Amino acid sequence: MVELKIGGVPEHFNMPWQLLLASGILEKSGITPSWTDYHGGTGLLAQALHDGDLDIGILLTEGAVQGIDKGKTFKIFSFYVDSSLTWGIHVPANSHCKNVADIQGKRYAISRFGSGSHLMAIIDAKARGWSTEDIKFEVIDNLVGARESFKYGDSDVFFWEKFTTKSLVDSGEFRRVGERKTPFSCFVICVSDKAFQEKREAVLTTINALFQQVNQFMASADKVKLISDFYNLKTEDVEAWLKDVSWAPRPHLNPAMLQTTIDTLKGLNLVSENLKVDHLVGPMESLEK
């Protein structure tokens, strides 16, 4: 049996992975998979792939691109979610910030540098015409850390996926003052260089099996209940979220979308000027088309 270490954020986007791992299909192909939730987000996932703690990781596109550019030893093998991600822009419920214009110059909570919460804070500020040079960041590790940071007044603003934080907005702990969509597809499947060299067939079998699971899941009449029960989300929130999300139906790399991501990050001086799409991607020839 080939052991495969897989990881991602504990969010509803990864429901197809959870169903695949529970199905026993991979074991029939001689693969023993394990899943780890990374509450710290994409920056932590990129480091885990580099360190050998993960073989396959599901990362935010912008974080994967920046991680590879900074020398992390993994590649993008496929887009996983083709739709963009809607980030909620949150402040503490008792904040003096009444609308999104009020967050300019405030302290941003981020899970870590290079994470989606970090990059999207910069993308948002740039889109609003604000200076990005003087943005102050407070590293809080994860959503739990963000709640603590807000509670003790250590930060003022926090970007996180809007439905993941909706229960905190509903309870009155957070207030959402705005939203920002990513200007590119949101999640990619990444494979460590070491895993691809040593476990190539297991990796490719797993990725192909995942997309079969994605298509079964999307055709399922129970998908709303599955997500609601597994991730403890309200049914109406899952229904609203599903209207805007689109998983990739098959393994694919979209060079134009990756170039858009590179260009966006270059415009913010977050990646090297000489970064090219070819630097980011793994060989796709063995994956089903």
Task: Give the location of each predicted region.
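Pocket-lining segment of extracytoplasmic ligand-binding domains
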Residues: 144-228
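Conserved C-terminal helix/tail region of periplasmic/extracytoplasmic solute-binding proteins
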Residues: 266-289
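Generic structural marker for isolated residues within well-ordered, non-membrane alpha-helices
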Residues: 22, 121, 165, 224, ...
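Secondary-structure end/capping motifs
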Residues: 197-272
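Short, glycine-/small- and polar/acidic-enriched structural segments
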Residues: 2-130, 137, 156-162, 174-177, ...
